[in-house]
UniProtKB/Swiss-Prot annotation:
<comment type="similarity">
    <text>Belongs to the RnpA family.</text>
</comment>
<dbReference type="GO" id="GO:0001682">
    <property type="term" value="P:tRNA 5'-leader removal"/>
</dbReference>
<protein>
    <recommendedName>
        <fullName>Ribonuclease P protein component</fullName>
        <ecNumber>3.1.26.5</ecNumber>
    </recommendedName>
</protein>
<comment type="function">
    <text>RNaseP catalyzes the removal of the 5'-leader sequence from pre-tRNA to produce the mature 5'-terminus. It can also cleave other RNA substrates such as 4.5S RNA. The protein component plays an auxiliary but essential role in vivo by binding to the 5'-leader sequence and broadening the substrate specificity of the ribozyme.</text>
</comment>
<dbReference type="Pfam" id="PF00825">
    <property type="entry name" value="Ribonuclease_P"/>
</dbReference>
<dbReference type="InterPro" id="IPR020539">
    <property type="entry name" value="RNase_P_CS"/>
</dbReference>
<dbReference type="InterPro" id="IPR014721">
    <property type="entry name" value="Ribsml_uS5_D2-typ_fold_subgr"/>
</dbReference>
<dbReference type="GO" id="GO:0030677">
    <property type="term" value="C:ribonuclease P complex"/>
</dbReference>
<dbReference type="GO" id="GO:0042781">
    <property type="term" value="F:3'-tRNA processing endoribonuclease activity"/>
</dbReference>
<keyword id="KW-0255">Endonuclease</keyword>
<dbReference type="GO" id="GO:0004526">
    <property type="term" value="F:ribonuclease P activity"/>
</dbReference>
<keyword id="KW-0819">tRNA processing</keyword>
<dbReference type="InterPro" id="IPR000100">
    <property type="entry name" value="RNase_P"/>
</dbReference>
<keyword id="KW-0378">Hydrolase</keyword>
<comment type="subunit">
    <text>Consists of a catalytic RNA component (M1 or rnpB) and a protein subunit.</text>
</comment>
<dbReference type="GO" id="GO:0000049">
    <property type="term" value="F:tRNA binding"/>
</dbReference>
<dbReference type="InterPro" id="IPR020568">
    <property type="entry name" value="Ribosomal_Su5_D2-typ_SF"/>
</dbReference>
Length: 139
């Protein structure tokens, strides 16, 4: 049986990683979510982290939000540039799946490009995430 899961290597798991993304990444807002996006330290693959506070709602509502975000990321991750993403809800309203798909397609590449442009201005080093697509085969 084929499992459509998000592998561990495609997740942000440690507090240290979440802090790195929030400190060094750029912030952008989708229709119902907030993205924190940082260029990946390791070329080749996107990573996803999800943060949902208890203010969002009860456990079943938070878990449903996480399932929606994971599935949207799983479907779009092969077309995203190499980056690390943390997703948070913007308000207490549950996002629609098609809005999440659209946000992943539009907001993430723009955020990575703007962050890379800022890095080039401050460090003089150009980083081109478009050349580093996630090459892992779907599981």
């Amino acid at each position: 049986m084929h499992r459509s899961t998000l592998p561990k290597r495609a997740r942000v798991l440690k507090r240290k990683q979440f802090l790195y993304i929030s400190r060094t990444g750029s912030h952008c807002q989708g229709s119902q979510v907030i993205f924190q996006v940082a260029p990946s330290k390791y070329p080749g693959c996107c990573k996803l982290g999800i943060t949902v506070s208890k203010k969002f709602g009860k456990a079943h509502k938070r878990n449903y939000f996480k399932r929606l975000v994971r599935e949207a990321f799983r479907q779009k991750r092969h077309s995203l540039p190499a980056c690390q993403i943390v997703v948070m809800p913007k308000n207490k309203q549950q996002p629609r799946f098609r809005d999440l798909l659209q946000d992943f397609s539009q907001q993430i590449p723009e955020a990575v490009e703007s962050k890379c442009a800022k890095n080039k201005l401050t460090t003089g080093v150009e980083y081109n995430p478009k050349n580093e697509k996630c090459e892992t085969a779907p599981l």
